Amino acid sequence: MINMDKKLVLFDRDGVLNEAGRITRPEELRLLSNALRGIARLTQAGIRVGICTNQGGIAHGVLDEITLARIHDKLRLVAGEFGGHIDRIVHCASADSDHPLRKPNPGMLLDQARHFGLTDLSGVPFVGDNLVDVQAAQAAGAVPVLVRTGHGKNTAYKHRAALRDVLSYPNVETAVNHWLKEAA
C-alpha cells in the first residue's frame, strides 16, 4: 500500500520519465509530459522525488559521467519548467548484474532511503516500466509500481503472472493523481 506520509516517491528514468531507449546526449532526452506534470503535482504536495537509474552505457563506453550529469541537468531544468523538482538522482554505472547498486538489486533504492532519512521504504512507491524495477522495489521493501509507458505494456503482458499483485497505471500522472486523491 502506498504511504504518502513518508513524503517520497522514487522513479526509474528511461521509459518512465522519458521515452524508452538509450540516451547518450542531452538532445536525445525526450521527456514525457504526463511524467513532468506528475512530478510537479508531487512537488506542489511537498513530496520529494528521487530517481534510480541503471546507466550501464558508462561501463560500455557509450556514455561518460560528465555527459550523464548534463542529461540530468536538462531533466531537472525541464521538470522545473513544469513546476516540479527532482530532489536526487542516483545511477549505477556498472553493467555487472551482480553489482549491488544495479537493478534488480536494491542498492540504489536503499541509498535513497538513507539519504532521505528513512529507516525503511515500506509504503514508498518505486515506479518503473521493467521487471527489474519491480524486483528492485520488492528487494528494497518499497511498493513496486509498473507504468505502461516505455517497456511497461510489454512487461505487463510478458510477465503478467508474476506481476498480478503489482500496482499498475497507464502513466506517471495517472498514478500520482490516484495517490494524492487517496491521501486527501
Can you annotate each of these PLM segments?
Residues I2-G50:
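Active-site neighborhood of HAD-like aspartate-dependent phosphohydrolases
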Residues I2-V9, E65-R88, D96-F126, N130-A184:
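Asp-based, Mg2+/Mn2+-dependent phosphohydrolase catalytic module
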Residues R13-L17, A93, R148:
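Short, small-residue-rich loop/turn micro-motifs
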Residues V16-E19, N54-G56, D87-R88, Q112-R114:
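A short alpha-helix capping/helix-coil boundary motif
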Residues V16-N18, I58, D133, G152:
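Active-site loop signature of alpha/beta-hydrolase-fold enzymes
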Residues N18-A20, G61, H178:
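Residues that scaffold the ATP/ADP-binding catalytic core of kinase and kinase-like folds
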Residues I23, E27-R30, G61-I66, P100-K103:
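Short, solvent-exposed loop/turn segments at secondary-structure boundaries
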Residues A35, I39-H72, H85-D98, A137:
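Substrate-recognition element of Asp-dependent hydrolases with the DxDx(T/V) motif
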